[in-house]
Amino acid sequence: MDREQMDREQMEYVLSGIGPRRQAFNRALTDGLEFMGGWLRRHWLALVNGVLITYIGLAILTPVAFAFGLDGPATAVFHVYRFFCDELPTHSFYIFGYQICLCQRCLAIYTSMLLSGITLAVLRKRREVPSITWWMWVLAMVPMAMDGGTQLFGLRESNVWLRLLTGTVFGVGTALFLLPQIQKSAEDEPLSAPIALQ
């Protein structure tokens, strides 16, 4: 911040009756928010990939926790995942005889999104990765909707390979639709609008 702008800002504070402690707080808060925004713009993909690794990792480690007798924490994690996945026993993988917290399709979706995110992290340093269009993303959803829908209405029973394949197609499609758009948005210059705290 240059001297003239600082003097103008000081004058605005004086005219509005904001004391020196509040001025210091406002400056510290503004600087902190700018730092966090800059950090997120630079490291958003690592954050997304980290969340996916944690989400998939917890789902896979829960049956391991059951096998080692950690029933309390494992049960808690299993119940939390119920909000995000149907966890049908017939549609899930098992480790040590205990069910993974995600069904086969959801596991394929999130794993393929993670692998796509890692691929984007490598490729984005070399060239721009274009986003697919929204209608291509909808097309990526169609096989999963058909497989799940026909099974839901009792027309046929899906199998593990179809669940994995349709989940992977949707996961890759979602990653190719969202991640390049977030990347482009993160590269754009942030709007420099003043933050008014009173």
Report each predicted region and the residues it spans.
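Cytosolic juxtamembrane amphipathic/interface segments immediately preceding
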Residues: A28-R41
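Hydrophobic alpha-helical transmembrane segments
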Residues: L102-A121
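Short, highly charged, low-complexity non-transmembrane loops/tails of multi-pass membrane proteins
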Residues: E187-Q198
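Hydrophobic cores of alpha-helical transmembrane segments in multi-pass inner/ER membrane proteins
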Residues: T111-S116, T168-S185
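Extracytosolic (periplasmic/ER-lumenal) interhelical loops and adjacent juxtamembrane/interface segments
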Residues: A67-L102
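Interfacial helix-loop-helix junctions of multi-pass membrane proteins
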Residues: L88-Q104, A145-F170
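Small-polar-interrupted transmembrane alpha-helices in polytopic inner-membrane proteins
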Residues: V51-A59, S112-S116, S131-F153
